[in-house]
From Swiss-Prot:
GO biological process: L-tryptophan biosynthetic process
Enzyme class per UniProt: transferase
GO molecular function: anthranilate phosphoribosyltransferase activity; magnesium ion binding
Residues reported in the UniProt entry to bind 5-phospho-alpha-D-ribose 1-diphosphate: 84, 87-88, 92, 94-97, 112-120, 124
Cofactor remark from the record: Binds 2 magnesium ions per monomer.
Keyword annotations from UniProtKB, A to Z: Amino-acid biosynthesis, Aromatic amino acid biosynthesis, Glycosyltransferase, Magnesium, Metal-binding, Transferase, Tryptophan biosynthesis
Gene Ontology CC annotations of this record: cytosol
Underlying gene: trpD
Binding, anthranilate 2: R170
Job of this protein: Catalyzes the transfer of the phosphoribosyl group of 5-phosphorylribose-1-pyrophosphate (PRPP) to anthranilate to yield N-(5'-phosphoribosyl)-anthranilate (PRA).
Protein name: Anthranilate phosphoribosyltransferase
Amino acid sequence: MTITPQEALQRTIEHREIFHDEMLHLMRLIMRGDMSPVMAAAIITGLRVKKETIGEIAAAATVMREFARRVEVEDNANFVDIVGTGGDGSHTFNISTATMFVAAAAGAKVAKHGNRGVSSKSGSADVLEALGVNIDLQPEQVAASIAETGMGFMFAPNHHPAMRNIAPVRRELGVRTIFNILGPLTNPADAPNQLMGVFHPDLVGIQVRVMQRLGAQHVLVVYGKDGMDEVSLGAATLVGELRDGEVREYEIHPEDFGMQMVSNRTLKVESADESRVMLLEALGNKPGVAREIVTLNAGTALYSADVAGSIADGIQLARDAIASGRAREKVDELVRFTQQFKR
């Protein structure tokens, strides 16, 4: 028996779970535009207030994947998504975007799923455009980019057209809802491996278990205890790791990898252009905090991509990729490849 939106709302008010099949049904109504904006707003707010469960999030992500314009990648060995939920309020340069270039230079295939900045001064789409990358690609062009350069950027609005049905509701509500945590769970290229940064410590255990239910292979969900949705240099980082179907939760520290713990304050930027400059300096092997945090995150991404057997081994590969100039070359490679599709 399907649940009505009114029954679902009542369930959230009573702090009771919406079951898997019911959540699938409700989410399909929202994505098709068959639920009124008032009911959609009430339900997603109700879910937020009662706190979304692992089952509810997994069901919602399943439907969002159903409605996505997919990127078909033939060989998914060492294939990883590097993504953050955003919303951490740290306003740093685009660490995960810089990480993509280093990971690709060290042998991973990266499908980065991202958007323009909402809470940040510069989203991944903004900084890639500032670098000269054409982000407006069709799914088959993204697949070609991954095959040719080892990197593909999927601009979220191009791959999730059904999101336009809920976008006005989200905009008007102006508060975090389940949709803020669905983005990183709905990679249109279905990368089996992932490094995912989250904006709240509670999400570490939740998101890694959602990915477990969604059938992912090797995932590291991270939260820097200084509030960053990245592996942090300024504090310990909480990690939820899914590997071989098993979940482990632990903490890592910069010192574990021979790195100094330093404040992330110097990584703040005010614009996409400032982010571009800092990203290029890090990839250009300029000594400093930016290079170190990119190295740390790239090492973690290479471990999640199974290119490296440990984070420590990944960090060494990342250092080599930056020092050799290969990471910086990857920027020019992606710009050249994507510009041929300029419309």
